[in-house]
Curated annotation (Swiss-Prot):
Residues 7-83 form the GIY-YIG domain. This is UPF0213 protein ORF82. CDD domains: GIY-YIG_UPF0213. Pfam families: GIY-YIG. InterPro entries: GIY-YIG_endonuc (IPR000305), GIY-YIG_endonuc_sf (IPR035901), UPF0213_domain (IPR050190). The lineage of its organism: Viruses, Viruses incertae sedis, Naldaviricetes, Lefavirales, Baculoviridae. SUPFAM superfamilies: GIY-YIG endonuclease.
Length: 104
């Protein structure tokens, strides 16, 4: 069994000290936030002095599903959608994404 398939994954959003939002996925949130704090991983977070966790979905997704939702948030949605998501704090991100139809 693949490492990706043997774990459950979540989608999270953090804010840098300059206000920039970062969206990512992980199977271990505390480990991943520690990596970000040490400057390991995402390049855009390496210079940040302080990170604030704003949102974390339920750890209920396989790697593929979590990666698809991360892609959707990063590429298909804007900052204001993410801010609404953070305010709403839905436990299950897939339901929130499917309920909010994109504008055409």
């Amino acid at each position: 069994m693949s490492l990706y398939r043997s774990k459950v994954w979540c989608v999270y959003i953090v804010r840098r000290d300059d206000g920039q939002l970062y969206t990512g996925i992980t199977s271990d949130l505390s480990r991943r936030l520690g990596e970000h704090a040490r400057g390991v991983g995402a390049r855009c977070l390496r210079g940040a002095k302080r990170l604030q966790l704003l949102y974390c979905s339920a750890s209920a997704y396989d790697h593929k599903t979590a990666a698809q939702m991360e892609y959707h948030l990063k590429r298909k949605r804007g900052k204001y959608f993410k801010l609404r998501l953070i305010k709403a704090q839905p436990r299950f991100l897939h339901q929130y994404l499917s309920a909010d139809k994109p504008l055409r």
